[in-house]
Amino acid sequence: MYEGVVQDLIDELGRLPGVGPKSAQRIAFHILQAEPVDVRRLAQALMEVKAKVRFCATCGNVAQEEQCNICRDTRRDPSVICVVEEPKDVVAIERTREFRGRYHVLGGAISPIDGVGPDDLRIRELLARLADGSVTELILATDPNLEGEATATYLARMIKPMGLKVTRLASGLPVGGDLEYADEVTLGRAFEGRRLLDV
């Protein structure tokens, strides 16, 4: 344990996802040893991202304007929507350069253990996007873990009666893994081999 502000910094860094106590301590001491100008740049970047970045009004992806770049891109196919859990999944899929449709970010996955139900996700917004009938295919690209599968099944059962083609990314993604950690080739193959969900 350190005193005062040093321990406060370590504690705050430790609250970040994927940063354990040892990593938090290493980062804190890196910051302490950094030049003041570098620390100011980091602090400024943190403040700016909180002030300028929001979530796209259409799809829920990160954006600096009302709509994200993908929703504003007229070259994207608006008839195909890929449903993902988080904005980081959009980045992972975009790296493959395989998908030319639009996205819908749910903001998580159904997880009763964590107290996250369907009403906590952006499902109502998805249904509103599907209401005009212009979407012909919905690709469910939730994580291949228990929560992601539960979310995909829930959505498929809800949307299937609308007559849309509902597909799920193919295997190749490790069960229990997260999309953001998949390499481009694996994720690209999973996209190519997506399958129809029969519920």
UniProtKB/Swiss-Prot annotation:
It comes from the Bacteria. A zinc finger (C4-type) spans 56-71. One of its GO terms (biological process) is recombinational repair. GO terms for molecular function: DNA binding; zinc ion binding. The keyword Transferase does not apply. InterPro entries: DNA_Rcmb_RecR, Rcmb_RecR, Rcmb_RecR_Znf, TOPRIM_dom, TOPRIM_RecR. Keywords: DNA damage, DNA recombination, DNA repair, Metal-binding, Zinc, Zinc-finger. Pfam families: RecR_C, RecR_HhH, RecR_ZnF, Toprim_4. Residues 79-174 form the Toprim domain. Belongs to the RecR family. PANTHER family: RECOMBINATION PROTEIN RECR (PTHR30446:SF0). May play a role in DNA repair. It seems to be involved in an RecBC-independent recombinational process of DNA repair. It may act with RecF and RecO. This is Recombination protein RecR. It comes from Streptomyces coelicolor (strain ATCC BAA-471 / A3(2) / M145). The gene is recR.
